[in-house]
Amino acid sequence: MLAADDIGEVPAAPCCPESGDETKNTDVKSDVNTAAPAGSEQLSQGGSDDALLSYVSAFIEKEVGSDLKSLKTLGKLIEQMTESKVKLEEQVLTISSEIPKRIQSALKDAEESKQLLDEFLEQEAPLFSSISSHLLMAQPWMDDLGAMITQMEEIERHLAYLKWVSQTEELSDNIQQYLMTNSVPEAASLLVTMTELDIQLQESSCTHLLSFMRATVKFWHKILKDKLTSDFEEVLAQLHWPFTSHTQSQTVGGSRPAGTPELYSSLDTLFCQLLKLQASDELLTEPKQLPEKYCLPASPPVTLPIQVMLAPLQKRFRYHFRGSRQTNVMSKPEWYLAQVLMWIGNHTQFLDEKIQPILDKVGSAVNARLEFSRGLVMLILEKLASDIPCLLYDDSLFCHLVDEVLLFERELHTVHGYPSTFASCMHILSEETCFQRWLTVERKFALQKMDSMLSSEAAWVSQYKDISDVDEMKVPDCAEVFMTLLLVITDRYKNLPTASRKLQFLELQKDLVDDFRIRLTQVMKEETRAALGFRYCAILNAVNYISAVLADWADNVFFLQLQQAALEVFAENNVLSKLQLGQLASMESSVFDDMINLLERLKLDMLTRQVDHVFREVKDSAKLYKKERWLSLPSQSEQAVMSLSSSACPLLLTLRDRLLQLEQQLCFSLFRIFWQMLAEKLDLYIYQEIILANHFNEGGAAQLQFDMTRNLFPLFSHYCKRPENYFKHVKEACIILNLNIGSALLLKDVLQSVSEHIPATAALNEVGVYKLAQQDVEILLNLRTNWPNTGK
């Protein structure tokens, strides 16, 4: 750096004179500003005097006002104003003494800051010049140093490169030496190390190094794999692997012939050594995969020693079920499916007892039996992927294939514990083309089944008609078979891997239910003239049964899960309103609600037809009873024994016969709705058409009550404990008509005395009337003819 004397004088900063002038200008401006208020004050003095006078006048008016007595407070007011004046003057003096000091202090601080800034500006110019010259002198050194650093980094990369090559060659030499001394376990361990180095180099851009490393790993992996595989196959051959029967598996696992301990020890050793080659095998071997359209779940390759164990079975499978072999028949998928299941079953015990302990010992999470099953299932998937395109347009062959695959899947999962997360045949059936064909075939055969079940002679007969305990629902055979069909369809698709595919099958089921409902409606319309006939009742029982089963299914876990899946799909596609989505989410509705509502509507319509039919018959048989001479019947005291009105017999006989008939033909829940609906209509009919249409003397009222309470109501006592509760109009009308004279007069007076705003509810309740309104009771009282003569 240069000395301070060499720098010379620093020219004055251009900002200093500008600062001095600015100070002077500020002083001038302050003088002007100080003078300005004085002038303005003089100009506005006249206005301010007026304002002051107004303020004082308002203040005195507020404090004193027009009351002369308040003048006494002027002294106190003057004292308060004087004190306020003194305080204000003190504040003004205090402020006027402090402000100049503050201004002086601020000016002093500003001056000091200005001086410091001037000093910094004087030092800045020589420092800038010194630094610039220093950087200029150092630039050649920096360029030389940068070149040296670049050269050193290049040398370090070369050294690292050579280190990787050297390490790889050293590992390769050691593997060779171990193999020459037949130390295979040590060689396998070194190959694992080399594989780890290869994996570490995956992100490197040194393509030649990567190729060299990969070629070296591949070279030794092939040698070790071939040797270990050969030795392992030899041991397996001595164990008679693969087993052709379950008995052979038990024999190998249970008996201990000569040399067995050494044999199993070799099996253990070779299995572990092959496991060590798993990483390098996955690195070098491209996994064989089916096309992406099958959407198989991601899964690691089958463990290497299990691959060796699977090899002879894979060879047999391809020999028998590929090409032109007689065993490779499109119409017999059950042959290869059953063969795979048999192989899994034959080897399960050996895998669990001999192989699984080896995997557990080395800390592997692999399940030997499931890994073995997974390898065999992949053979099935490859076979299905190649066969299905040839079967798509042959309905019988395709349907047979699907049936056999579903049976295979069921046994695979239930008997052999195959997890649903693994690749399975359902993934192949879920492929778009195959799945749509499956839906089409499923619909076709379901409709054919519906046609046959409805045209059957036993379609409307319950198969449990002779077993009273079982036949509570009185379900006709066609409805039973139809719901069994739906249940079978559910079992067929419930293991599909995706919710979207399940929802498509659910839509198929709903379409089938709707189709069956339409068919039932068509048959029902043909039977409308015989609404009480056997077939009409069977249709009604079928509708009720299907609705009840669907409501029960709606609470099933499987369909609740589908409901949640449907909710997510509908929310994404904006198919439903917010209210409908909310009902689905809160489980207020179900996936079958639309179908259940349609069935319930049909059920109610059919029941209404039956009730109307019976009611018409009852009305026809009640014509004589309507014309009964209620006004002139003898009183109860004039009769030895009360008996049923002869004109009521046709009415009650018709009612009894129809109730018995429908009780036998309808299921319990439907019959309960039927008789309650009929009772409601009958109650209103008797009340409106018989009671309100006539006048009653004492004998007539007693006879009506006897007919109702001792004959009509007991007809319904078989179905409930208190049948009179379903005939409230009739029951209460009989009460009013049969009140003794005193009670009737008293009630009449009470009803006449109360106003509209004060109903006579208490008085009516006291005599047992709860249903009828006050006006109805007044009408009934006027229908009585046995009032005392008051002389009016």
UniProtKB/Swiss-Prot annotation:
Pfam families listed in its UniProt record = RINT1_TIP1 (PF04437)
Can you cite an annotated GO cellular component? endoplasmic reticulum membrane
Read off the Gene3D superfamilies from this record: Dsl1p vesicle tethering complex, Tip20p subunit, domain D (1.20.58.670)
Q: Coiled-coil stretches, from where to where? A: 71-123
Membrane topology label: Peripheral membrane protein
Residue numbers spanned by region Disordered = 1-47
Instruction: Please classify the protein's predominant subcellular localization into one broad category.
Output: cytoplasm
Keywords assigned by UniProt, alphabetized? Cell cycle, Coiled coil, Cytoplasm, Endoplasmic reticulum, ER-Golgi transport, Membrane, Protein transport, Transport
Q: Which domain of life is it from?
A: Eukaryota
Q: Which GO terms describe its biological process?
A: endoplasmic reticulum to Golgi vesicle-mediated transport; mitotic G2 DNA damage checkpoint signaling; protein transport; regulation of ER to Golgi vesicle-mediated transport; retrograde vesicle-mediated transport, Golgi to endoplasmic reticulum
- Annotated RINT1/TIP20 domain ranges read 220-792
Instruction: Name the InterPro entries for this protein.
Output: EXOC6PINT-1/Sec15/Tip20_C_dom2, RINT1_Tip20
Biased composition, class Basic and acidic residues, residue ranges: 21-30
User: Which family does the similarity line name?
Assistant: Belongs to the RINT1 family.
User: What quaternary arrangement does the UniProt entry report?
Assistant: Component of the NRZ complex composed of NBAS, ZW10 and RINT1/TIP20L; NRZ associates with SNAREs STX18, USE1L, BNIP1/SEC20L and SEC22B (the assembly has been described as syntaxin 18 complex). Interacts directly with BNIP1/SEC20L and ZW10. Interacts with RAD50 during late S and G2/M phases. Interacts with RBL2, preferentially with the active, hypophosphorylated form.
General function of this protein:
Involved in regulation of membrane traffic between the Golgi and the endoplasmic reticulum; the function is proposed to depend on its association in the NRZ complex which is believed to play a role in SNARE assembly at the ER. May play a role in cell cycle checkpoint control. Essential for telomere length control.
Q: What is this protein called?
A: RAD50-interacting protein 1
Tell me which species this is from: Mus musculus (Mouse)
